[in-house]
Curated annotation (Swiss-Prot):
It comes from the Eukaryota. One of its GO terms (biological process) is inhibitory synapse assembly. This is SLIT-ROBO Rho GTPase-activating protein 2C. GO terms for molecular function: protein heterodimerization activity; protein homodimerization activity. It comes from Homo sapiens. The gene is SRGAP2C. This is one of the 3 duplications of the ancestral gene SRGAP2/SRGAP2A which has undergone human-specific segmental gene duplications. The appearance of SRGAP2C in the human genome is estimated to 2,4 million years and corresponds to the beginning of neocortex expansion in human evolution. The emergence of SRGAP2C at the birth of the Homo lineage probably contributed to the evolution of specific structural and functional features of cortical circuits in the human cortex. Expression of SRGAP2C in mouse cortical pyramidal neurons leads to the emergence of human-specific traits of synaptic development, characterized by increases in the density of both excitatory and inhibitory synapses received by layer 2/3 pyramidal neurons and neotenic features of excitatory and inhibitory synaptic development. Mice humanized for SRGAP2C expression in all cortical pyramidal neurons show a shift in the fraction of layer 2/3 pyramidal neurons activated by sensory stimulation and an enhanced ability to learn a cortex-dependent sensory-discrimination task.
Amino acid sequence: MTSPAKFKKDKEIIAEYDTQVKEIRAQLTEQMKCLDQQCELRVQLLQDLQDFFRKKAEIEMDYSRNLEKLAEHFLAKTRSTKDQQFKKDQNVLSPVNCWNLLLNQVKWESRDHTTLSDIYLNNIIPRFVQVSEDSGRLFKKSKEVGQQLQDDLMKVLNELYSVMKTYHMYNADSISAQSKLKEAEKQEEKQIGKSVKQEDRQTPCSPDSTANVRIEEKHVRRSSVKKIEKMKEKHQAKYTENKLKAIKAQNEYLLALEATNASVFKYYIHDLSDLIDQCCDLGYHASLNRALRTFLSAELNLEQSKHEGLDAIENAVENLDATSDKQRLMEMYNNVFCPPMKFEFQPHMGDMASQLCAQQPVQSELVQRCQQLQSRLSTLKIENEEVKKTMEATLQTIQDIVTVEDFDVSDCFQYSNSMESVKSTVSETFMSKPSIAKRRANQQETEQFYFTVRECYGF
């Protein structure tokens, strides 16, 4: 036999509901705290961005001034009146052209960094200030909207509580009325059963006395039955009335329950999401995007300007050419480097001879001297060929040393999480002391040998 179902008492149901509502209320409070924290973090972030770019603007301006001082220091030397024409002539030489472009690049970098500092101070920082003001103002309004949404939700929960209590009350009345009706029905059945038993137990008597007794008993039974019937009808009417109220209250409770669940779902799934991205974050990310893109535009244009200057310097570096510079130098100072006039034969005391005299007795001497010169030239030619090969090999060695492609320092900019790797990379570059000392010693030794050969055998 199955045990009867256990029903929760009203107090248990109310307690569970109160607990659930308290949890929701606590959640709502934490939601506002969370949004407050987000607002504080946002304000702090925007303030940090302002301070960062303000400090960066100062650094850029200081850097610009230092670059300007650097350029002006050397440009002032170039503009000095001493040897002005010589300096002007030197400008056509490729190394001097590189130097001038380098100074111009520094000047342009100085101007660009001044512009960058101005953009930070008068464009980017005001944008962050505006974003901060807008964000604070919108958050304040969003908080008011969120508070109103939470108040509306709590109002719905309170209404559900009231409807639920009404349902419990009417349902309890209905159950009570039903119980009384059943009790009345039992009494009616019991009364009817008594009447039947009494009729069965009656013994035969005289006709007159029997008739009187029966009439009296019937009257009593009818009176009792009528009372019970009236009581039953009264309980039936009360039960019907309470049952109707209970059904209506139950319907109201179910409708309110459905509406409450829909309101809770709407608040948590839609309202909260809309509150954050359509109220609290309204325009925040877009405005921040514009401010940071202004920074990117400034930095990229600075980089583009620098690249243009570096491209000009790179072009000048590629045009570094010793042969062309030698030709330009000789053309500029033609009077210095042009060959002098030939020495002419100066006749003495009217002597007009201007050619060798190959007559006897000097002919044989001239022939012998010519043979000696030819023999000597053959020997020198062989020696010079060997010396030439040695000089060419030595010169090639020097050129290999001075043209080695050791200028790529890209590895120095491959940073990792550990600064030790950076230091290690830098220490292994061309400028490390052991490496450069060895290179310099090798180069100087080769140069010394080369010029020794030149001095011994001439050019």
